[in-house]
C-alpha cells in the first residue's frame, strides 16, 4: 500500500512538471515564430525580448503588450498570436492529448492524470470524455461568437478583414486574452471605439463569461442542464461567486465611476468593466480617468480572476469563496466550513490560504520593485502587477515603456498566474510522505 502511494505521488508530481514544461515549450516556439521577419509588418527581425514578452502574454492569455498587435504584427504574426492564445487558453496538455486520441492511439493512466491536473478535474474517471467535450464545445462557442461579431466588423472593415477580426476577437474574448486589433484606429485603444455599441459589448461579455466560468461547470451544465441541484459543489460555488463578482462591482461603477451619460450607456459600461476586469483585459473607456478607489477595486478583481479549470488566471473565484466562507465560519465559532449543505475539506481551506499568501506577496513585492525601478506611483505599478498575475491584460499605459527588469517581472507573474501557484510549488518540491506522523498539538493565539 505504501509503495502504491509513493508511485501515485511520483506520477502526480510528474504531471505538474509536464504541464509547466509544455507551457515553456509553447512559449519558446511562439517566441521563435514571432522573431521571424514575416511576423512583422516591416519584415524585420523582432528582438528576442519583445517577441518573448508577446509570446508569454499570448500563451498565458493575458493581453499586456509592448508592440501594438494591429500595427506592428503582420497577418502571419497575428495568426501566431491567435494560435498561442487558443492553445494557451485550452491548455497545451488538453490540445495535445486530444490530438493523440484523434489519431487512434490509446491514452494511458499517466496521460489521464496529467490531463486531470491540466483542467483541474476532481477525478481521473471520465477525463478523456470531458476533455473532448471541452474542446468541441469551445470551438463551437468561438465560431458562434465570430458569426455574431461578423455583421459589426464586416460592415466597418469589409468582408475579408471583418471576418478575420470577428474570428480573432471571438477567440481572444472566449480565452479571456484581451488581445485586440483596433490599434488601426489608435494604438493600444482596445474596444474604446465601440464603447456605445451595445450589441458588440454584450457578445464580448458573454464570450468572456463563458470562457471564464470553468470547464467543469460546462460539464455539469451539459450533463444536468437546468437541474442546478445536481451540480457539483464547485459548480454551484463558481456560479454564485461569479454572479456576485459581476453584479456588485458593476453597481459601484454605475453609481461612482460612470455617473454621467444615459442610463443605457452607464449600465453597459459598468457591466462591461465589471466582467472584463477580472479576466479578459478589454476596455471600452479610459482607465486612467478612474479615481483611486475605482482603480483599487479593479486591482482586487484582477487578483481574484476567473474560475478553476477555465481559460482565465488569478487566484480563482472558488479560492475567494472558500476564504470568505472560512472567515464566516471563524466569526460564527464553528469548526466546519460549509456551503450548499456540504462540508468543505480542511485541505481546500489550507490550499486557499496558501494561494492567497503567494499571490499577495508576489503581487505587492513586484509592484514595489517596479515602482522603485521605474520611478512610478505605487498604485499604478500595483495595477500592472495585479493585471499580470491575474492574466487580465488591463494597463494604465505603462507596459510598453517599462525597462527590461520590469518586463521580466511581469513575464514571471503572467506565467505564475496562468499555470497556477500550487502547480509551480508542487512541481518544484518533493512529494510529501502520506504517512507523516502527527506531532503534539499546542495552541497559539492569532488575531
Where are these predicted regions, by residue range?
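Membrane-proximal intracellular helices of multi-pass ion channels
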Residues: 1-447
Amino acid at each position: 500500500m505504501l509503495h502504491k502511494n509513493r508511485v501515485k505521488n511520483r506520477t502526480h508530481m510528474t504531471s505538474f512538471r509536464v504541464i509547466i514544461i509544455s507551457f515553456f515549450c509553447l512559449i519558446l516556439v511562439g517566441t521563435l515564430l514571432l522573431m521571424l521577419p514575416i511576423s512583422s509588418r516591416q519584415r524585420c527581425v523582432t528582438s528576442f525580448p519583445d517577441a518573448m514578452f508577446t509570446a508569454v502574454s499570448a500563451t498565458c492569455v493575458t493581453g499586456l503588450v509592448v508592440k501594438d498587435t494591429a500595427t506592428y504584427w503582420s497577418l502571419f504574426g497575428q495568426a501566431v498570436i491567435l494560435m498561442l492564445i487558443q492553445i494557451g487558453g485550452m491548455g497545451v496538455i488538453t490540445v495535445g492529448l486530444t490530438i493523440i486520441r484523434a489519431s487512434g492511439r490509446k491514452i494511458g493512466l499517466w496521460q489521464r492524470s496529467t490531463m486531470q491536473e491540466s483542467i483541474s478535474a476532481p477525478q481521473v474517471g471520465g477525463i478523456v470524455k470531458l476533455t473532448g467535450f471541452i474542446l468541441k464545445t469551445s470551438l463551437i462557442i468561438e465560431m458562434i461568437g465570430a458569426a455574431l461579431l461578423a455583421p459589426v466588423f464586416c460592415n466597418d472593415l469589409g468582408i475579408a478583414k471583418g471576418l478575420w477580426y470577428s474570428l480573432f476577437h471571438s477567440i481572444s474574448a472566449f480565452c479571456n486574452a484581451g488581445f485586440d486589433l483596433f490599434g488601426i484606429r489608435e494604438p493600444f485603444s482596445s474596444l474604446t471605439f465601440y464603447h456605445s455599441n451595445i450589441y458588440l459589448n454584450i457578445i464580448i461579455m458573454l464570450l468572456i463569461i463563458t470562457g471564464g466560468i470553468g470547464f467543469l461547470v460546462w460539464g455539469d451544465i451539459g450533463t444536468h442542464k437546468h437541474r442546478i441541484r445536481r451540480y457539483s459543489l464547485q459548480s454551484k460555488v463558481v456560479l454564485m461567486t461569479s454572479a456576485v463578482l459581476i453584479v456588485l462591482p458593476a453597481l459601484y461603477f454605475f453609481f461612482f465611476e460612470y455617473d454621467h451619460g444615459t442610463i443605457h450607456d452607464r449600465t453597459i459600461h459598468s457591466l462591461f468593466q465589471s466582467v472584463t476586469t477580472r479576466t479578459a483585459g478589454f476596455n471600452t473607456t479610459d482607465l486612467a480617468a478612474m479615481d483611486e478607489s475605482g482603480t483599487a477595486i479593479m486591482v482586487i478583481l484582477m487578483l481574484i480572476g476567473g474560475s478553476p479549470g477555465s481559460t482565465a488566471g488569478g487566484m480563482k473565484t472558488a479560492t475567494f469563496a472558500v476564504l470568505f466562507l472560512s472567515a464566516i465560519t471563524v466569526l460564527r465559532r464553528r469548526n466546519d466550513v460549509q456551503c450548499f449543505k456540504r462540508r468543505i475539506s480542511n485541505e481546500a481551506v489550507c490550499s486557499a490560504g496558501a494561494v492567497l499568501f503567494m499571490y499577495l506577496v508576489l503581487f505587492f513585492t513586484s509592484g514595489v520593485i517596479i515602482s522603485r525601478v521605474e520611478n512610478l506611483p505605487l498604485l499604478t505599478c500595483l495595477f500592472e502587477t495585479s493585471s499580470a498575475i491575474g492574466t487580465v491584460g488591463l494597463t494604465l499605459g505603462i507596459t510598453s515603456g517599462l525597462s527590461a527588469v520590469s518586463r521580466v517581472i511581469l513575464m514571471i507573474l503572467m506565467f505564475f498566474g496562468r499555470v497556477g501557484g500550487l502547480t509551480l510549488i508542487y512541481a518544484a518540491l518533493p512529494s510529501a510522505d502520506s504517512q507523516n506522523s502527527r506531532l503534539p498539538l499546542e495552541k497559539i493565539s492569532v488575531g
